[in-house]
Amino acid sequence: MDPVAVHSCHLLQQLREQRIQGLLCDCMLVVRGVCFKAHKNVLAAFSQYFRSLFQNSSSQKNDVFHLDVTNVSGIGQILDFMYTSRLDLNQDNIQVMLDTAQCLQVQNVLNLCHTFLKSAPAAQLPGLPCAGGFSLQSVALDGTCAVSEHYPPPSLQECPVEGPQAKVPAEVNARAPSANFSRPTEVSKPDAAGGSCPELPCKQPNHYYKLRTLYSKQYYKQTACPSQVPATQQPLTRSASTDLAAADSQPPVEGRPAVLETPEHLPSTFVAPPVRNSGNDSEADPLSEPPAKQMRLKKAMHLKKLNFLKSQQSAECTSHPEPDNGLARREESAAKEDAVERAGSQTAEEKGRGELGPESSREEELPGAPASWEDPSQALQPQKQYACELCGKPFKHPSNLELHKRSHTGEKPFECNICGKHFSQAGNLQTHLRRHSGEKPYICEICGKRFAASGDVQRHIIIHSGEKPHLCDTCGRGFSNFSNLKEHKKTHTADKVFTCDECGKSFNMQRKLVKHRVRHTGERPYSCPACGKCFGGSGDLRRHVRTHTGEKPYSCEVCSKCFTRSAVLRRHKRMHGRADARSPVVLGELSRPIEPSDLDRSQSSDSFSQDVSVTLMPVSVKLPVQPVESSVAGFDGHCSGSYCKLRSMLRPPGMSDQDRLSLEPSKLAKPPELQSQPQAYAYSDVEPSAGVEQPQADGMAVSRSSLATLDNHCTEPLGSRAPSVTYRNSEGQFFSSMTLWGLAMKTLQNEHELEQ
């Protein structure tokens, strides 16, 4: 087997398996609630319609396309053909397949349908509404008009059934004009057309305005009753309507005007006017005028997006340099109608109506003609809006309105076959299924992170820019997307309607209650793939994984420090705010010049009696008595140092924090001579006895008298105290500060021993 063929088969098989499994499918076609997953590349390769649709909607975020087509089987069979190259055609589905292929512009399916029609006799095609007209020539005209630039001419030339015209009864000749009242002479007079069909594609104009006309006729074909089809031809007035009703008794393919407007049947005369030789122009002219009038019907808007109307007038003028009178009139009418559509001029429309002659006015007087025939300016009206009956929101398409109504009714017809969750739209179900399969086709171009939905990528990109356009009205906090803002606003509400069944705790959000219940159950379904540690919430797992990867996505704008959690970053930013608010006060105090009054105030405000309060308990041991010289010597070496330590450790009761801040700089800024010359003070008891041991009671009295003297001396300001020399000469026994502290500790120890 050819390696290229093997390679192609393998590629096609893999694409088909991916479509069946729903993997890597980047679009979804929704037809009457039925979802068809597919690949855009495959659809664009086979369908010119999808190629233009995808190219013109490249900026579209949604990958779900709603096709309002009545028959679902036609879409499904064409998709199967794209992925398998097999198409099952029979007399029952040939009409559906031909209609759908014409709408979607699938050239391969059109070729197969035409081949099937060529091989099948006209009498064996019950699905066709008009056996004579459609089977003989309309197929060729359809193929020529819709896809004339790509369709091979030989297949078009062989479309008519060979030799049926001599055997066609007279009723067939009457039936053909009923469905196609612009071509009665071609069926009844084959000699006028030369008796051969190969000339038809040669003289048939290959302009895109005819394809536009094909879609334009669908609105009329759906709304108009078959019995109300105009029958202006005098020789075929009543028999045509009767035969048409019999022909339309077979079930046609119904359609609605939507994104894709599927016709009930596709006779060629609703596509374009027929082509004749110049032999019978006088008979063909009055009967060829109504199609020019039909071209003023509703236009399919999506064809304008495909640029099919861009250069139709110029191409029409250069295509046939020598047209006959009937063709010239039809082309002139079409050109005038296009000018009216583009410029909105009604004067040109009236002029074109006048050139159509009496047959045009007779056609307008027909009973049952739709309003679009009588009012040519209807095509220029804005597109119809479909408003919701409950909230009044307008929509351009009825299918979008139906989807919107589900938000009011709560209907969720789409169910996940894995977890059973229901959704109101098929696109939401598709995004949900990706979470089960793990497929993440959307990638962030900045960091490379992958997402399952396109909307998640758009919300993620805002994180890199740091933009938070959605602000809370209550607290002013900003959010990158509106959904997070809605969740945040619930935290400000006092209503707590979600209550835990086990502990009775209430919450204002459902997700908080679900997270709280995990604490009761102890369930930890989220495990770390690196270390195996389990967590109760997915957010906890994400934060834990950052400890392995080292990712710190939250950075401070002030110092550029990065953090793994947003809460830590918020606390860090508060530190910058406190420092900025406190720094001016401290710097102002330090920069203020030092005044002498500050020094005096600081000295007078500090009192040793206010700082230290010593309570001594009775002791049962003898206290050691030291001479005055040793006491004074010990005090001179330690008194000033211990006093400075106590002063720095203790604070006066009435001093505030601000006063302390204002005093400390002044202490630091004292002159060197004040700090280098500490004054020494000696303390002793009032009794003049020295060096004599006293009884236990006498020792206790000495200690108490010494403490009383110390307390009296500490009440004096430092500046008014006498020098220590006076105490050295007049006082005898003295207890240093360390001795007093030791005495107090010993007293407490003895008291504890007595209690034991």
Curated annotation (Swiss-Prot):
GO terms for molecular function: DNA-binding transcription factor binding; sequence-specific DNA binding; transcription coactivator binding; zinc ion binding. Pfam families: BTB, zf-C2H2, zf-C2H2_6. Residues 25-91 form the BTB domain. Residues 176-197, 226-290, 311-379 are annotated as: Disordered. Widely expressed, with highest levels in white adipose tissue and kidney, intermediate levels in brain, liver and heart, and lowest levels in spleen, brown adipose tissue and muscle. A zinc finger (C2H2-type) spans 386-408, 414-436, 442-464, 470-492, 498-520, 526-548, 554-576. The keyword Transcription regulation applies. InterPro entries: BTB/POZ_dom, SKP1/BTB/POZ_sf, Znf_C2H2_sf, Znf_C2H2_type, ZnFinger_BTB_dom_contain. One of its GO terms (cellular component) is cytosol. Residues 226-242 have a biased composition (Polar residues). GO terms for biological process: negative regulation of cell population proliferation; positive regulation of transcription by RNA polymerase II; regulation of cell cycle. The keyword Cell cycle applies. Keywords: Activator, Cell cycle, Cytoplasm, DNA-binding, Metal-binding, Nucleus, Repeat, Transcription, Transcription regulation, Zinc, Zinc-finger. It is found in: Cytoplasm; Nucleus. Residues 319-341, 348-365 have a biased composition (Basic and acidic residues). Interacts with EP300, KAT5/Tip60 and ZBTB17. The interaction with EP300 is direct and leads to synergistic induction of CDKN1A. On the CDKN1A promoter, forms a complex with ZBTB17; this interaction leads to additive CDKN1A transactivation. The interaction with ZBTB17 may block ZBTB17 repressor activity. Belongs to the krueppel C2H2-type zinc-finger protein family. This is Zinc finger and BTB domain-containing protein 49.
